[in-house]
C-alpha cells in the first residue's frame, strides 16, 4: 500500500518544496550569500546567448507606441477604464515601478521589472496594479523578447501621458528583466504591512530606506501614520523624495503633475478586499485583491481607500490640479472606506468633477493630506504657486522630473537605447566626456607600465588607488567606477577611505607620467588620467605576481575619459562614499550590522560572486592594500607578492584566534604551541575560515596546487572590477 503523504512516483515526502525549518530559521544571523548569485542563467528562460539590447534594436518602436495609444481607450469589461481611459492607471504603474529607487544604496527602481514579483506585486500601495500589467499582456505577448516588462511598464506610462496631451522629455530602453525576486534589497524590518519600526528618535528614518511605512512607495497620503497634518506630511514628503534623489522643485512638479490625472479608489470598506496576489487562490491566476463589493470594479473599486479625483479634467494635461488646490479652502472628511481626505468648503464645487463611469453623476474634487502639503508647506507652497502662474515652467519641470524618476537607476547615457533618448546631457546622469583622442596601443601600454613601476610609488599604493577609483561603482544604479577619474574631484578626493594624503601623492606622480606621455605625442594620441589610474593598478598586480614567481598579463582596455568638477554633482556623489569596505579592511565607524555582512553587501553592489569576493580579499591583503596600510589580515611574511598566503595561514590549525583585549571586531592569531602572537585580523578576515560556505572556497585557494589558480582568478576578478562601469565594452 502507498504510504500516506508520499509521492507515488518518487517516494518524496509531500510539501518538500515548501515549509520545513531552513538554515536561516536555525541561524538568523547567518551570512546571506545567495544575494551574490541572484538570477542565474538557469533561471532565465531566454538562455545565455540572449542579448536584450540587440533584440530591442529590432523593435518597431512606433508600432509599439501606437498599440499602447490604442490600448489607453480600449476599455475592457473585466476591468473597465476610469473615464474611458487607462492612462492614469498606467502612470501609477510606471511611477510605482520607478518609485522604489532610493539613492542611499541605489537599489530599487524600474530597471529590472521587479514589480512582477513579491514583495512588490503584493504591496498595499500597489493594489490593483496587477490589473494594469494584465492589460499590457497582449502587447507584451505581441512583441515578445523585443521589449522587456521593465521597459514596457515605463513606456506605457510615457504613452499614457502623451495620450492625455503631455509632451514627455524622452524615453530610453535598456532595462533587462529579472526572473526572480531580488535577495539584496532591504525593504525594512517590519513584519506587518504599513508598519513603521524604521523610525527612531525624532522621526529619524532608517538608512537606506526612503518610504515611510512597509508596503508604501512614498508617504502615507492620509498623513504621517494616518494623521491628517499637512505640515507634518510635508516633512515626510521632503525626506522621502530627497532619499529618492529629488529636490523640492522636482518633488512639487512630480506630485502636481502626477495628480493632474485620474482618481483614487475607496468605494467601500477594505473588508471587501481579498488577499494580495501572492496570497490569492490558485484559480485567481496571479491576480489579487478580489473585491466582493458590488461588481468589484468600476464604481466599486477599492484601492487606497481614498475616493475621488483631484481635478475636473482627470484625463487631460492642464493646470487644473494647482488651480483646484489653491482655489478652495478644504474640509477634512472621511471617504466611504474610512480614509482621511479633504473636500472643498465651497458647496458650488460639489458637481465640478465628472464620475469615472456614470456620465449622469458629478462629484466634488478631493485632495489628500499629502496634496495639501504642497500648499501649506513653507517651501513647497511658493514653488507650487510659481508653477500655477507659469504653466510652461510647470510642464518643463514635470517632464524632466518624470524622466529622472523613470531613468535614475539606468546609469550613464551609453546604456540608453531607442529613438527617443534626449540629446541633452543631464548632471544626474554623471556625464563623462566623449573620447576625442586616439587611444594608446600595446606598445604604449608596455612603456607606461615601466614608467609607473619606476615612479617610486609602492605596489600597494598603485593597487589601492586603482581599487579606490574603480570600486566606487555600484551595480544597483550603475553609478561610480573608474571612468571619469572622479577620485581626483570632490567629494571622492576627500573621502577618508581613499586616504587623501596618499591619494594626492599617487595622483601627482601619475599626472606627471601622463603629462610627459601626452606632450611627447605628435598626433592625437592621449592617455586620460582615468585610464592611467587603472593601468597603474594593473601594473602593480602584474609586478606582485612576478614577485611571487608568476608571469601574467593583467588585461587593460583604454577608453576612459576625465570628467570635470562641473560634471560632478557633489551632493549626489556623496552617497557613494563607503561606510565600510572589507576589501580594504576599512570601517568608518561602529555599526549594528557586522563588518562581514557589510562586505557581502558591498560585494553584491560590485556585481561580484562569493568566489570573486574571496579571491579579491585574499589578494588585497597580501598586496598590503588595506586602509592606512593596516596589518590586520595581512597574513603573509611576503607583502606585495601575489601569493595565496592569506588562505594558507588563515586555515593553519597551528594558529588559534581570540578576541583582542580591546574587544569588538579585532582578533589575534596565537601560535598554539608557543603562545606567541603571529597575526592580527578582523571579522572580515576571519569569516573566510568561520563561515562554512566561504571556508569551502578558501580551502580551494589554500591548497598546494592552487597557487597559480589563485593568481589567475585574482586577475580575472580584478579586471571585472576595473571595468565594472565600462558599458561601452559590453
From Swiss-Prot:
Where in the chain is the Tryptophyl-tyrosyl-methioninium (Trp-Tyr) (with M-244) cross-link?
A: 95-218
The record, for Gene3D superfamilies, names: 1.10.520.10, Peroxidase, domain 2
Enzyme active site: 96 (proton acceptor)
Name what cofactor the protein needs.
heme b
Q: What's the record's note on cofactor binding?
A: Binds 1 heme b (iron(II)-protoporphyrin IX) group per dimer.
What does the record give as EC number? 1.11.1.21
- What Gene Ontology cellular component terms go with this record? cytosol
- Protein known as: Catalase-peroxidase 1
Q: Which GO terms describe its molecular function?
A: catalase activity; heme binding; metal ion binding
Does the record bear ATP-binding in its keywords? no
The family database entries (NCBIfam families) matched by this protein are listed as:
cat_per_HPI, PRK15061.1
Q: Which family does it belong to?
A: Belongs to the peroxidase family. Peroxidase/catalase subfamily.
Segments passing through the bilayer: none
- Note the Pfam families from the entry: peroxidase
Q: List the keywords (alphabetical).
A: Heme, Hydrogen peroxide, Iron, Metal-binding, Oxidoreductase, Peroxidase
Organism superkingdom:
Bacteria
Q: Which organism is it from?
A: Alkaliphilus metalliredigens (strain QYMF)
Amino acid at each position: 500500500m502507498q504510504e500516506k503523504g508520499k509521492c507515488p512516483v518518487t517516494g518524496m515526502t509531500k510539501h518538500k518544496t515548501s515549509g520545513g525549518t531552513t538554515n536561516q530559521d536555525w541561524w538568523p544571523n547567518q551570512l546571506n550569500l545567495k544575494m551574490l548569485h541572484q538570477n542565474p542563467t538557469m533561471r532565465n528562460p531566454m538562455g545565455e546567448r540572449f542579448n536584450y539590447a540587440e533584440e530591442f534594436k529590432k523593435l518597431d518602436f512606433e508600432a509599439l507606441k501606437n498599440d499602447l495609444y490604442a490600448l489607453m481607450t480600449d476599455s475592457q469589461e473585466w476591468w473597465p477604464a476610469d473615464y474611458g481611459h487607462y492612462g492614469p492607471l498606467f502612470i501609477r504603474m510606471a511611477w510605482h515601478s520607478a518609485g522604489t529607487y532610493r539613492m542611499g544604496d541605489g537599489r530599487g527602481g524600474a530597471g529590472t521589472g521587479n514589480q512582477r514579483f513579491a514583495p512588490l506585486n503584493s504591496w498595499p500601495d500597489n493594489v490593483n496594479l496587477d490589473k494594469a500589467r494584465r492589460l499590457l499582456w497582449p502587447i507584451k505577448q505581441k512583441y515578445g523578447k523585443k521589449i522587456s516588462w521593465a521597459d514596457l511598464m515605463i513606456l506605457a506610462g510615457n504613452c499614457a501621458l502623451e495620450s492625455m496631451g503631455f509632451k514627455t522629455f524622452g524615453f530610453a530602453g535598456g532595462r533587462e528583466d529579472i526572473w526572480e525576486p531580488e535577495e539584496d534589497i532591504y525593504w525594512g524590518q517590519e513584519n506587518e504591512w504599513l508598519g513603521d519600526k524604521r523610525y527612531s528618535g525624532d522621526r529619524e528614518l532608517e538608512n537606506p530606506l526612503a518610504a515611510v511605512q512597509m508596503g508604501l512607495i512614498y508617504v502615507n497620503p492620509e498623513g504621517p501614520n494616518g494623521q491628517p497634518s499637512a505640515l507634518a506630511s510635508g516633512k515626510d514628503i521632503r525626506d522621502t523624495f530627497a532619499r529618492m534623489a529629488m529636490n523640492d522643485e522636482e518633488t512639487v512638479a512630480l506630485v502636481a503633475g502626477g495628480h493632474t490625472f485620474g482618481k483614487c479608489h475607496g468605494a467601500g470598506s477594505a473588508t471587501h478586499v481579498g488577499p494580495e496576489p501572492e496570497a490569492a487562490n490558485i484559480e485567481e491566476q496571479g491576480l489579487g485583491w478580489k473585491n466582493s463589493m458590488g461588481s468589484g470594479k468600476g464604481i466599486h473599486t477599492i484601492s487606497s481607500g481614498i475616493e475621488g479625483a483631484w481635478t475636473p479634467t482627470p484625463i487631460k494635461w492642464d493646470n487644473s490640479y494647482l488651480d483646484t488646490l489653491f482655489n478652495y479652502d478644504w474640509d477634512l472628511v472621511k471617504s466611504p472606506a474610512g480614509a482621511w481626505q479633504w473636500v472643498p468648503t465651497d458647496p458650488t464645487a460639489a458637481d465640478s468633477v465628472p464620475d469615472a463611469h456614470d456620465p449622469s453623476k458629478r462629484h466634488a474634487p478631493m485632495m489628500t493630506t499629502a496634496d495639501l502639503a504642497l500648499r501649506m508647506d513653507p517651501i513647497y507652497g511658493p514653488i507650487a504657486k510659481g508653477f500655477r502662474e507659469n504653466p510652461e515652467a510647470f510642464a518643463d519641470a514635470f517632464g524632466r522630473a518624470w524622466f529622472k524618476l523613470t531613468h535614475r537607476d539606468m546609469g550613464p547615457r551609453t546604456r540608453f537605447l531607442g529613438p527617443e533618448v534626449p540629446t541633452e546631457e543631464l548632471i544626474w546622469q554623471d556625464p563623462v566626456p566623449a573620447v576625442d583622442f586616439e587611444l594608446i596601443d600595446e606598445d604604449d601600454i608596455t612603456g607606461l607600465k615601466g614608467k609607473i613601476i619606476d615612479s617610486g610609488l609602492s605596489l600597494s599604493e598603485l593597487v589601492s588607488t586603482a581599487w579606490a577609483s574603480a570600486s566606487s561603482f555600484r551595480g544597483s544604479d550603475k553609478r561610480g567606477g573608474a571612468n571619469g577619474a572622479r577620485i581626483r574631484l570632490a567629494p571622492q578626493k576627500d573621502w577618508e577611505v581613499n586616504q587623501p594624503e596618499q591619494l594626492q601623492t599617487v595622483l601627482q606622480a601619475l599626472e606627471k607620467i601622463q603629462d610627459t606621455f601626452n606632450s611627447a605625442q605628435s598626433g592625437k594620441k592621449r592617455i586620460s588620467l582615468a585610464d592611467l589610474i587603472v593601468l597603474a593598478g594593473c601594473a602593480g598586480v602584474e609586478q606582485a605576481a612576478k614577485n611571487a614567481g608568476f608571469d601574467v598579463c593583467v588585461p587593460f582596455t583604454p577608453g576612459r575619459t576625465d570628467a570635470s568638477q562641473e560634471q560632478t554633482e557633489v551632493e549626489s556623489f556623496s552617497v557613494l562614499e563607503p561606510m565600510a569596505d572589507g576589501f580594504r579592511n576599512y570601517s568608518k565607524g561602529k555599526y549594528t550590522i557586522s563588518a562581514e555582512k557589510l562586505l557581502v553587501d558591498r560585494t553584491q553592489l560590485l556585481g561580484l560572486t562569493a568566489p570573486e569576493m574571496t579571491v579579491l580579499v585574499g589578494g588585497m591583503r597580501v598586496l598590503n592594500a588595506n586602509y592606512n596600510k593596516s596589518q590586520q589580515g595581512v597574513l603573509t611574511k611576503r607583502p606585495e607578492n601575489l601569493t595565496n598566503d592569506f588562505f594558507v595561514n588563515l586555515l593553519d590549525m597551528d594558529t588559534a584566534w581570540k578576541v583582542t583585549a580591546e574587544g569588538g571586531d579585532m582578533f589575534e592569531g596565537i601560535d598554539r604551541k608557543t603562545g606567541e602572537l603571529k597575526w592580527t585580523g578582523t571579522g572580515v578576515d576571519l569569516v573566510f575560515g568561520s563561515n562554512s560556505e566561504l571556508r569551502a572556497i578558501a580551502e580551494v585557494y589554500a591548497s598546494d596546487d592552487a597557487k597559480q589558480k589563485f593568481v589567475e582568478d585574482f586577475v580575472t576578478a580584478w579586471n571585472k572590477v576595473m571595468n565594472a562601469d565600462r558599458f561601452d565594452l559590453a
